[in-house]
Amino acid sequence: MGTLSVNQNKLQKRLRRLAGEAITDFNMIEDGDKVMVCLSGGKDSYTMLDILLYLQKVAPIRFEIVAVNMDQKQPGFPEHVLPEYLKSIGVEYHIVEKDTYSVVKEKIPEGKTTCSLCSRLRRGTLYTFADEIGATKMALGHHRDDILETFFLNMFYGGTLKAMPPKLLADDGRNVVIRPLAYCSEKDIEAYSQLKEFPIIPCNLCGSQENLQRQVVKEMLLEWERKSPGRTEIMFRALQNVVPSQLADRNLFDFASLRIDESATPRFLDVMNL
């Protein structure tokens, strides 16, 4: 890649700045951390690795980066692509082999969504491997749009008000998951991926499942953004400004104990000046 144009330079600086802000805001990476960067071969994880490698050079703290890819034994998976790329940029890496493809195909009927089971199997394997290599943080490539899509998926189809947190302590208590691209838009990541010419590997399991609920939500959000530019950013900001007293979850706010405050100053209506 040659010299960047003005717009390309702005794009790179914006992604680096937003990732740095997210890392700082949520204290994602600390001095001495060993960060396991989960690399799928998609645009998001390539971009995350690229940005983390840059931040590693300029950050005031020291931390290790180890790239990890999980070979799920999907038919036609180009096993040489990631090792060649990671060797070319001088990054320590591991390839974890686990035939989750066969398990998913056996358990999920033809035509049904494989994403949920596939992600659970992959997550469990990666948690175990992170523990084995002594990783203190596990970095995933989810971006702002992923977080918003998950929010609406849970609300529309699950009846819960939750999304993907930028930082998460796993249920096992032994893994801390971080999402450095939490503030970054998919549009910017797509443009950056094309700019950097990452060797993208498509997913044979879920890449062709056009009728997924997530795809429906994604198209809804894209349409909203087309009609009202900036709406996506505003909605994400809302996830950072939660007011439990204005919702209806009794576990988050004690509605039952609300009483009139007898010591409060009374309000008098001046009927003469109405």
UniProtKB/Swiss-Prot annotation:
- Claim: Magnesium is one of the keywords in the record: yes
Q: Name one GO biological process term.
A: tRNA thio-modification
Q: Which SUPFAM superfamilies match?
A: Adenine nucleotide alpha hydrolases-like (SSF52402)
Fetch the Pfam families from UniProt: ATP_bind_3
Q: Does the keyword Cell membrane apply?
A: no
**A GO term, aspect molecular function:** ATP binding
This protein's major location comes to cytoplasm
- Cofactor binding mode, per the note? Binds 1 [4Fe-4S] cluster per subunit. The cluster is chelated by three Cys residues, the fourth Fe has a free coordination site that may bind a sulfur atom transferred from the persulfide of IscS.
Q: Which residues are listed for [4Fe-4S] cluster binding in this entry?
A: C115, C118, C206
Xref: InterPro entries: Rossmann-like_a/b/a_fold, TilS/TtcA_N, tRNA_Cyd_32_2_STrfase, tRNA_thiolation_TtcA_Ctu1
Q: Which reaction does it catalyse?
A: cytidine(32) in tRNA + S-sulfanyl-L-cysteinyl-[cysteine desulfurase] + AH2 + ATP = 2-thiocytidine(32) in tRNA + L-cysteinyl-[cysteine desulfurase] + A + AMP + diphosphate + H(+)
Compartment list: Cytoplasm
* Further information: The thiolation reaction likely consists of two steps: a first activation step by ATP to form an adenylated intermediate of the target base of tRNA, and a second nucleophilic substitution step of the sulfur (S) atom supplied by the hydrosulfide attached to the Fe-S cluster.
The protein's matches in HAMAP family, at most eight in alphabetical order, are given as: TtcA
Stated name of the protein: tRNA-cytidine(32) 2-sulfurtransferase
Please report the organism this UniProt entry assigns to the protein: Pseudomonas paraeruginosa (strain DSM 24068 / PA7) (Pseudomonas aeruginosa (strain PA7))
